[in-house]
């Protein structure tokens, strides 16, 4: 498995994409009930074809979809497209499901829509606006209980930023027939609506995609249900059998992966503009 860490400028304790990538690698390579899985973390799109060809799935973590934030995005997207055509899996975690207006065509078209099944449409997009907002208590519930990714975790409530009003395509924003909504949450609390917060796709090329819009806060990797949900999705995307009770891992020591901070450190308030004389 290939874990690709993109750039991030979020405050300490939020996103923590490098630490998050290392944590995912440690969990995947030390699964108690699915031993022998190999994973590599990279901090740029790998130029070596051999690295790309060896991957059964590629996991992205970063502030928006990383390939659109790095130079030569056209080339790297084409190389990722080659991986997808051979049936490689793809996973995007939290903001890595995001695309900016400059990344997509005016109608919202982008290959990620088909590779992953849906995406977070940034407010700069002309065609659609998803919503990013922190909720103190978002309850995440299963929407497809029979799916392997749903094995072994229960409904949970989390203080996080599960994106809502995610984009699933031009058909009145209905997911395509090969897309399964895996989990929903009734958000926002003042006008609750069942929002898709995780989904997967089984593509015509034989590959699989999994998108989940959490975790925003690094400390939420401690949540066993959320962690199992994510790791199940990664395993499934690589066409491995998800164990009956979901994958099992030891509780991770979050400090071990060298985040800027485990706890969220809000940015200092911006200085107020001086009143004109």
What do these predicted regions represent?
Residues 3-4, 182, 210-214:
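Active-site-proximal beta-strand elements of phosphoester/diester hydrolases
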Residues 10-13, 132-138, 154, 187, ...:
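Active-site rim elements
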Residues 19, 23-26, 75, 79, ...:
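Extracytoplasmic/secreted proteins, especially bacterial periplasmic and envelope-associated proteins
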Residues 23-26, 188-196, 202-277:
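Extracellular ligand-binding/catalytic regions of CAZymes and related secreted enzymes
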Residues 121-206:
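Catalytic beta-strand/loop cores that center a nucleophilic Ser/Cys/Thr
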């Amino acid at each position: 498995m290939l874990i690709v860490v993109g750039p991030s400028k979020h405050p300490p304790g939020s996103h923590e994409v490098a630490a998050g990538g290392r944590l995912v690698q440690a969990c995947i390579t030390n699964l108690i009930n699915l031993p022998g899985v190999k994973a590599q973390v990279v901090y740029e799109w790998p130029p070596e074809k051999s690295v790309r060809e060896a991957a059964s799935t590629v996991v992205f973590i970063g502030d928006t979809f990383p390939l659109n934030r790095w130079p030569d995005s056209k080339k790297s997207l084409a190389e990722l497209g080659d991986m997808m055509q051979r049936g490689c899996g793809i996973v995007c975690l939290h903001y890595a499901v995001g695309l900016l207006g400059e990344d997509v065509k005016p109608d919202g078209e982008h290959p990620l829509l088909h590779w992953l099944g849906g995406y977070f449409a940034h407010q700069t997009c002309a065609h659609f606006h998803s919503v990013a907002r922190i909720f103190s208590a978002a309850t995440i519930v299963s929407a497809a209980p029979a799916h392997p990714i749903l094995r072994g975790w229960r409904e949970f409530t989390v203080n996080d930023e599960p994106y809502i009003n995610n984009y699933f395509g031009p058909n009145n924003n209905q997911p395509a027939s090969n897309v399964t909504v895996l989990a929903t949450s009734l958000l926002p609390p003042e006008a609750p609506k069942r929002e898709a917060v995780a989904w997967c796709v089984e593509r015509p090329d034989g590959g699989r995609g999994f998108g989940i819009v959490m975790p925003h806060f690094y400390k939420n990797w401690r949540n066993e249900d959320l962690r199992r949900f994510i790791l199940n999705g990664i395993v499934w995307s690589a066409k491995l059998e998800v164990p009956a009770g979901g994958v099992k891992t030891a509780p991770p020591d979050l400090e071990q992966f060298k985040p800027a901070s485990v706890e969220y450190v809000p940015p200092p308030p911006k200085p107020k503009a001086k009143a004109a004389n």
